[in-house]
Amino acid sequence: MTTQLEQAWEIAKQRYAAVGVDVEEALRQLDRLPVSMHCWQGDDVAGFENPAGSLTGGIQATGNYPGKARNAEELRADLEQALSLIPGPKRLNLHAIYLESDAPVARNEIKPEHFKNWVTWAKANKLGLDFNPSCFSHPLSADGFTLSHANDEIRQFWIDHCKASRRVSAYFGEQLGTPSVMNIWVPDGMKDITVDRFAPRQRLLNALDEVISEKLDPAHHIDAVESKLFGIGAESYTVGSNEFYMGYATSRQTALCLDAGHFHPTEVISDKISAAMLYIPRLLLHVSRPVRWDSDHVVLLDDETQAIASEIIRHNLFDRVHIGLDFFDASINRIAAWVIGTRNMKKALLRALLEPTAQLRQLENDGDYTARLALLEEQKSLPWQAIWEMYCQRHDTPAGSQWLDSVRAYENAVLSQRG
């Protein structure tokens, strides 16, 4: 540890102590908050089932930066590089299309054995795993419908895929000793004016009920459902709307997933957290950055990311909110994208933990909104960066932009060889 860092740390501790904040306790709390990194940033959501296939489901990865992972070994190596540059606890979020098998496997026939390499790797890297059925980029999703499909056989195929995915998720939780959160998102919707909006939602409701009918140990597996406003090719109607899934999660007591990019551009999920928590047991967050639409840009340390983190901390939702990331930018170095986005999420959590919330809440209860605003703004100038740098130091990760040197070295030695 450098003398300069030690001095900055001591000064920062004193500054925060003056406003009633224990920085050591803040760092202890930060170590209770894993962030689930999404594997699909590493290969532009291609997966290993059919890497040459096109991405469908109304989502899009734009850009053609060289060096993307082409197989599981490369993806895991890239993830290890990213993980080494991010301090504190992490998890990995997998999609079903990232299975490994010597022979083709139908999606309704995936099994835990197809993900055993991921579990072995997760154990070695001390990671929890989360999971997602992949209801897109498949011939039976080509017309834009899956769990709400009017064709009984096609709908049953996707039901069986989600059932099989739940068993994989439970396998993760059982093997790793931490529950896997399995999120169900389907792209179902219509491009233009829709006459019957009711029937597809009724089918989706019934399909989801069948999917979650098998009782699984909550210590191993947690069900979550995710809404969306629209997707490319489904601009006019989305079966799984916010109202649909809020009702479903409330009535079935599943977790609800809020994705930062899945709402109208003027809506923010930070304002939805406290409302949802009144009705549902758990919340899954997909922190992202929508630019005009659900563009899935890399997460910044911006106002909304900070507001999301503050909601979690202010209301002590450590054990009820699961923090995941969801972005995929193919225009920049993919490892750097992981590092930037995940570090920013952790920075936002740290800044929230360094807030004198009790004091601010008292001012609010007293009706002293002048002091509330003044202190909220003044705390932005407190030396949180020194606390972050100490946190990085304790976790043997670079504190500042030095991490980029490691990414560039890896790019030159490894990524550049992939063509």
Curated annotation (Swiss-Prot):
> Catalytic activity annotated for this protein?
L-rhamnopyranose = L-rhamnulose
Where it sits in the cell: the answer is: Cytoplasm
Q: How is the cofactor bound?
A: Binds 1 Mn(2+) ion per subunit.
Q: Where does Mn(2+) bind?
A: 262, 294, 296
EC number, UniProt record: 5.3.1.14
Q: Which domain of life is it from?
A: Bacteria
Q: Which GO terms describe its cellular component?
A: cytoplasm
Major location (coarse) = cytoplasm
Instruction: Kindly list the biological process annotations in GO that this record carries.
Output: L-lyxose metabolic process; rhamnose catabolic process
Q: Which InterPro entries match?
A: L-rhamnose_isomerase, Rhamnose_isomerase, Xyl_isomerase-like_sf
Its annotated pathway reads: Carbohydrate degradation; L-rhamnose degradation; glycerone phosphate from L-rhamnose: step 1/3
Question: Does the record carry Cytoplasm as a key word?
Answer: yes
What is its cofactor?
Mn(2+)
Pfam families assigned to the protein according to its UniProt record, in alphabetical order: RhaA
Q: List the disulfide bonds.
A: none
Q: Name one GO molecular function term.
A: L-rhamnose isomerase activity
Q: What does this protein do?
A: Catalyzes the interconversion of L-rhamnose and L-rhamnulose.
**Family, per entry:** Belongs to the rhamnose isomerase family.
Name of the protein in its database record:
L-rhamnose isomerase
Organism the protein comes from: Klebsiella pneumoniae subsp. pneumoniae (strain ATCC 700721 / MGH 78578)
Q: Give the gene name.
A: rhaA
